[in-house]
């Protein structure tokens, strides 16, 4: 089915207000969920909203909590999220990293006691739109087996790197081949995964999203490389925030909350003039996209460039929502 942005935001707002969320908080949160969905990231927008409400109802998320700065060391700050709403807090933390970068050239905010930030790419994009390089990542509950194991002991720990090119170039990637959100998107659409995304119950690689969702044997991106990167990202976020590691979140909490996150902004224009920056970025992009194609009918893609078209299509033609997901939201 198709809905407008206003209809989608209104549905989110209604549910939030029914939980006695303050009007301004409900409006800002509904706006972020709707913008994420409008951008084409259904897995961490509309599809994730029922799960967000579940955690809100369970008390994992404290909607009136205010993040507090704990430590300030020039370009580096440490904050405690107080388990506030995840996407609103993350937006504030990247804004703070940008403020620090405007003073120091680089800004880093390490956040502890946070909630799921929904679409991590929103915060990298937020920095890149203002002309900054944006880098951020989060740890999570253990939802992926380390390489060589069957039991979940590491997080998917998504990493985002956004570059202020025209259009914005951005990598937004889980440390697994597919996020659990994308497994759900493909399952709801009745599709196999495009490449192997995990192991079946017999230990064989599989493209069946439902099987992986059930047994949790999701495949690390790049096999042992994604497993290793997940581990070091967790270590850095834990140390810089003085927060909880994947192990602590998994063993000590009843669900995924109290995670640790990193937000970095770099002001490129302190290091290079605008014309030179743009020319260098354009040369990189042209060099890549003019390579001989493996398939004449398939264009060479640059990461994140598809979001401009997805956003335009959704604004022109309406936002496609899975009927079952919409029904869940209406029932909340």
UniProtKB/Swiss-Prot annotation:
Q: What is its EC number?
A: 1.1.1.130
Give the function comment from the record: Catalyzes the reduction of 2,3-diketo-L-gulonate in the presence of NADH, to form 3-keto-L-gulonate.
Q: Name the family.
A: Belongs to the LDH2/MDH2 oxidoreductase family. DlgD subfamily.
Q: How does it assemble?
A: Homodimer.
| Catalyzed reactions | 3-dehydro-L-gulonate + NAD(+) = 2,3-dioxo-L-gulonate + NADH + H(+); 3-dehydro-L-gulonate + NADP(+) = 2,3-dioxo-L-gulonate + NADPH + H(+)
- Entries under Gene3D superfamilies matching the protein: 1.10.1530.10, Hypothetical oxidoreductase yiak, domain 2, Hypothetical oxidoreductase yiak, domain 3
Does Oxidoreductase show up as a keyword for this record? yes
- The catalytic site is made up of 44 (proton donor)
Q: What is the name attached to this protein's record?
A: 2,3-diketo-L-gulonate reductase
Naturally occurring in which organism (per UniProt): Salmonella paratyphi C (strain RKS4594)
> Pfam families annotated for this entry?
Ldh_2
Q: Which PANTHER family has this protein been placed in? A: 2,3-DIKETO-L-GULONATE REDUCTASE, OXIDOREDUCTASE-RELATED
Q: Which major enzyme category is it?
A: oxidoreductase
Q: Report the locations given in the UniProt record.
A: Cytoplasm
Read off the InterPro entries from this record: Diketo_gul_Rdtase, Mal/L-sulf/L-lact_DH-like_ah, Mal/L-sulf/L-lact_DH-like_NADP, Mal/L-sulfo/L-lacto_DH-like_sf, Malate/L-lactate_DH-like
* UniProt keyword annotations, A-Z: Cytoplasm, NAD, Oxidoreductase
Predominant localisation class: cytoplasm
Citing just one GO molecular function, the answer is: 3-dehydro-L-gulonate 2-dehydrogenase activity
The residues that hold NAD(+) are: 168-174, 224-225, 304-306
Which cysteines are disulphide-bonded? Answer: none
Its Gene Ontology cellular component terms are: cytoplasm
């Amino acid at each position: 089915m198709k809905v407008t942005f206003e209809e989608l935001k209104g549905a989110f707002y209604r549910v939030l207000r029914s939980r006695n969320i303050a009007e301004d908080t409900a409006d800002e949160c509904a706006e972020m969920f709707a913008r994420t969905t409008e951008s084409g990231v259904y897995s961490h927008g509309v599809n994730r909203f029922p799960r967000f409400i579940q955690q809100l109802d369970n008390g994992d998320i404290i909607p009136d909590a205010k993040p507090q700065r704990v430590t300030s060391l020039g370009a580096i700050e440490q904050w405690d999220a107080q388990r506030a709403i995840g996407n609103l807090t993350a937006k504030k933390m990247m804004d703070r990293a940008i403020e620090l970068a405007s003073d120091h050239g680089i800004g880093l905010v390490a956040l502890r006691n946070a909630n799921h930030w929904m679409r991590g790419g929103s915060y990298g994009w937020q920095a890149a739109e203002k002309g900054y390089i944006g880098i951020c990542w989060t740890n999570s509950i253990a939802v992926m087996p380390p390489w060589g194991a069957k039991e979940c002991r590491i997080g998917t720990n998504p990493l985002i790197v956004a570059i202020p090119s025209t259009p914005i170039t951005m990598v937004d990637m889980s440390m697994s081949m597919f996020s659990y959100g994308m497994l759900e998107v493909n399952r709801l659409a009745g599709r196999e995964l495009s490449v192997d995304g995990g192991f079946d119950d017999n230990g064989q690689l599989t493209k069946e999203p439902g099987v992986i969702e059930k047994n949790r044997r999701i495949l690390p991106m790049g096999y042992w490389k994604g497993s290793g990167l997940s581990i070091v990202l967790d270590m850095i976020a834990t140390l810089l925030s003085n927060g909880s590691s994947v192990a602590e979140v998994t063993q000590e909490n009843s669900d995924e909350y109290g995670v640790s996150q990193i937000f970095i902004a770099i002001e490129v224009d302190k290091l290079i003039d605008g014309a030179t920056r743009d020319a260098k970025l354009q040369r990189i992009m042209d060099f890549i996209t003019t390579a001989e194609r493996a398939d004449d009918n398939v264009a060479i893609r640059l990461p994140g460039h598809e979001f401009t078209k997805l956003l335009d299509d959704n604004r022109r033609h309406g936002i496609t929502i899975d009927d079952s997901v919409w029904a869940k939201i209406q029932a909340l």
